[in-house]
């Protein structure tokens, strides 16, 4: 019997953080990366929210996998995800109202995130609850990692702040430094992601296409 963190389970958990990242390798979930990464805080909150939804949706679908009729499995998956997204939305309204307002409709649109349905279809329907939970955590954190990196650079270079705190010294501005207003525009998220993809593929030869 495999241990809770066997080599296979470690690969399931850690693979999405690097060589099988859902955003920069599988090209999933990019749309929300445009919308919520102009600042670091909403990027972190969205990353945590998606991680929670993917992990628990994976577990629920895995537990039900032998009882769900094949012809309605997509509907069941959507209902499970919608219920979890509703819970996450209410929690954010209760404990992080300002960030929830910044995220706006994009919390509700978690249900349309390709990563969610992709993991439910590709993994949870064919694996046990623990493996599915690890897969959800891994893919959620892989997604969150990219959002945080993009949000970090967009807020730092676009506003001179991180988490709302000024980090670029006033002396820089006195000498003529100007924030790059382009960084807070949605197209710059694509460009930052493209740079991350380039760096990632340069470091991982197995991802390079001939």
Q: Which residues make up each language-model segment?
A:
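Transmembrane alpha-helix boundary signature
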Residues: 87-102
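Hydrophobic core segments of alpha-helical transmembrane domains in multi-pass membrane transport
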Residues: 30-34, 50-55, 82-89, 111-115, ...
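Short amphipathic alpha-helical coupling elements at transmembrane boundaries
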Residues: 15, 62-66, 131-139
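Cytoplasmic-side transmembrane-helix entry/capping segments in multi-pass membrane proteins
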Residues: 68-81, 102-108, 135
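Intrinsically disordered, low-complexity non-transmembrane regions of multi-pass membrane transporters
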Residues: 1-14, 204-210
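C-terminal transmembrane helix-loop-helix hairpin of multi-pass membrane proteins
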Residues: 133-210
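C-terminal ends of transmembrane helices
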Residues: 57-70, 117-127, 201
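Structural signature of hydrophobic alpha-helical transmembrane segments
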Residues: 40-56, 76, 100-111
């Amino acid at each position: 019997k495999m241990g809770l963190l066997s080599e296979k389970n470690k690969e399931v958990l850690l693979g999405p953080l690097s060589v099988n990242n859902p955003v920069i390798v599988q090209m999933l979930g990019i749309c929300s990366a445009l919308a919520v990464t102009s600042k670091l805080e909403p990027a972190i909150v969205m990353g945590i929210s998606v991680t929670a939804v993917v992990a628990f949706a994976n577990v629920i679908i895995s537990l039900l996998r032998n009882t769900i009729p094949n012809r309605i499995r997509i509907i069941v998956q959507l209902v499970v995800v919608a219920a979890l997204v509703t819970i996450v939305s209410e929690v954010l309204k209760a404990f992080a109202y300002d960030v929830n307002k910044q995220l706006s409709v994009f919390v509700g649109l978690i249900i349309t995130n390709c990563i969610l349905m992709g993991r439910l279809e590709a993994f949870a329907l064919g694996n046990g609850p623990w493996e599915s939970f690890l897969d959800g955590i891994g893919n959620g954190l892989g997604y969150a990692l990219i959002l945080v990196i993009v949000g970090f650079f967009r807020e730092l270079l676009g506003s001179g702040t991180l988490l709302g705190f000024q980090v670029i010294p006033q002396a820089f501005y006195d000498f003529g430094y100007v924030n790059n207003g382009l960084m807070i525009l949605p197209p710059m998220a694509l460009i930052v992601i493209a740079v991350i993809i380039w760096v990632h593929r340069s470091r991982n030869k197995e991802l390079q296409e001939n």
